[in-house]
Amino acid sequence: MKSRLALLLQLASAIAGAADNNFEARCEKLAAEAKFTAVFEDKPVRRDDGIRIADLARFTRSGSSVNHSTLGVTRAEPAASMVLSVRTLSNRDGRVCAVPSLQLKLGLSSFEVLLARELGPHPCRRRIVDEHEEEHVTVWRNHLRIGARLMPVGLRQALGQVAYFSSVSEAESVLRQRADQQLASLLSKLKDGINAAHQQIDSTASYRDAENRMRACP
């Protein structure tokens, strides 16, 4: 009788182990099917060349370079939106495995270049200032494009592994929180890179070069 009971227990344990292995295998397949994508949606630049030099300073962001031109200002508001879906599987013992898929959209909610009205009668000087602001425009676009390429990689590394939970609602809540945190961290790093690039453009050497070129204008 004891040997029969032991055999039954071993059989039950083997069945449970096989079920666990099958559950974990299905969960790993779920992770392999997860998708992390991002796109950059460009926005046309709005241009305004009718603002007086005296008024341009109020459009300059706090934290801008001390060398920031008062003849032109580039302003942009980056925007990001995320669509998160969580796929789950449940085991007979109540365990839940889950993996998120994520679609990210990077763009700009506003994008404008402001040039001093006083540059109007001086096309050579206006062109030099406009070229400088165009460098800032390029920084915004290039960094956001690169961010759209690289951020899905970072998000997959942080979120693409199978995670186990006690319920579907817990899985959805926790993974949403993790995704929000990871996205905030990546956006912060992207912003730091953008600011550093703008500071380089607004360097003392850059402004000295622009001033020398404007002195050479007719």
Identify the meaning behind each predicted range.
Residues 99-122, 126:
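Short acidic, glycine/tyrosine-flanked loop/strand segments centered on an H-E-D-like triad
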Residues 123-135:
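Short alpha-helix carrying the canonical HExxH Zn2+-binding catalytic motif
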Residues 1-5:
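Bacterial N-terminal signal peptides that target proteins for export
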Residues 21-70:
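Charge-biased, low-complexity intrinsically disordered regions
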Residues 16-19:
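Boundary at the C-terminal end of the N-terminal hydrophobic targeting segment
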Residues 6-14:
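Bacterial N-terminal signal peptides
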Residues 134-151:
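Catalytic Zn2+-binding segment of zinc metalloproteases
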Residues 43, 57-104, 158-218:
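Metalloprotease/metallohydrolase-associated module, dominated by Zn2+-dependent proteases
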